[in-house]
């Protein structure tokens, strides 16, 4: 059995150019530009993030595209920061780049500091400083046993 891990996260989007610009503004590095305008790939701290036309993604997965996506799709992505100031900075940048701030940064019930934003396509991100999950030098959370 291959080692269990997440290697790539693909987000279905209706406006690839707008959403790609949003992620570039947040500091994600776009790669594989030769792939054309059908898909955008970004380095995302040990995993790859891709943006792909939502209708084509549904078709590829043999699913029916939803006519109108709900506000909450049952998944959040997370961006952990080394400090509370980092959380504030990411949320401010997301808001200025066209994201929608869903929850301003604040103390969390679990002892950290966090807030939420949605990208221009409605994908929800939590931005958090979690003192219980220190970050490794490459930005990955260290989970306790």
Predicted regions and their residues:
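Short, small/polar residue-rich loop motifs at catalytic or cofactor-binding pockets
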Residues: 110-112
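Minor-groove-contacting beta-hairpin "wing" of winged helix-turn-helix DNA-binding domains
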Residues: 39-43
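Glyoxalase I/VOC metalloenzyme domain signal
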Residues: 1-7, 12-34, 44-100, 118-145
């Amino acid at each position: 059995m291959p080692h269990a891990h997440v290697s790539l996260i693909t987000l279905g989007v209706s406006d690839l150019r707008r959403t790609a610009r949003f992620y570039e503004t947040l500091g994600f590095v776009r790669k594989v530009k030769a792939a054309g305008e059908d898909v955008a790939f970004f380095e995302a701290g040990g995993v790859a993030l891709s943006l792909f036309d939502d209708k084509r993604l549904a078709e590829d997965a043999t699913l029916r595209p939803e006519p109108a996506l709900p506000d909450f799709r049952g998944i959040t992505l997370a961006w952990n920061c080394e400090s509370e100031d980092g959380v504030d900075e990411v949320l401010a940048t997301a808001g200025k780049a066209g994201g929608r701030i869903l929850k301003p940064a604040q103390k969390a019930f679990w002892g950290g500091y966090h807030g939420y934003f949605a990208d221009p396509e409605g994908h929800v991100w939590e931005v958090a400083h979690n003192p219980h999950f220190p970050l490794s030098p490459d930005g990955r959370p260290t989970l306790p046993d």
